[in-house]
Amino acid sequence: MRKTIYAKMTALPVGLCALAFAVTSCGSSEYKKFADNEGKQVASILRENDCLACHSENAPLPFYGNLPLIGPVVQADMKEAVHYVDLTAMVEALENGQPVSEVDLAKVENTALSGSMPPAKYSHMPMHWGTSLDDNEKAVIISWAKNVRKDRFTTETV
């Protein structure tokens, strides 16, 4: 009887640890198939890391978005995220080889440089583990931003 109780008491923590290891150890690598196109790589990185879950006007509420205590917080966070930047048009433009705005470029570049996204309260929740940019993804975004800025947003000095 006592062994059964201990087995049940340890099942949940052990299961959560296994899930955490599995989720955090599997980095996104889908973007690598676009090695010849930095713009598509960036679009893929933003999608894979679930940036559009908050930074898109079209993002559906997550399953916990209507729960009594957490729901209003989630809804307010999503509204604030879209107010800061809606990545929908940018990702679509990148996927279709179209130019992006200099403002969106600067915001995404700054985020990659500073590591400020996703916020800790988002990335530390079990259902969002693994959404932070890794060093390779940051390098791709920074390189892309530098190249786009050089090609589209610099002028000859007099």
Protein language model regions, located:
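Short cysteine/histidine-rich zinc-coordinating motifs and their immediately flanking basic loops
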Residues: F63-L69
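C-terminal capping alpha-helices of c-type cytochrome domains
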Residues: A112-A120, P126-T155
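Bacterial N-terminal signal peptides
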Residues: P13-A20
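The canonical Cys-X-X-Cys-His
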Residues: L46-A59, M117, I141
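Electrostatic cytochrome c docking/interface patches
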Residues: C26-L46
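Extracytoplasmic electron-transfer domains, predominantly the class I c-type cytochrome c fold
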Residues: P72-M127
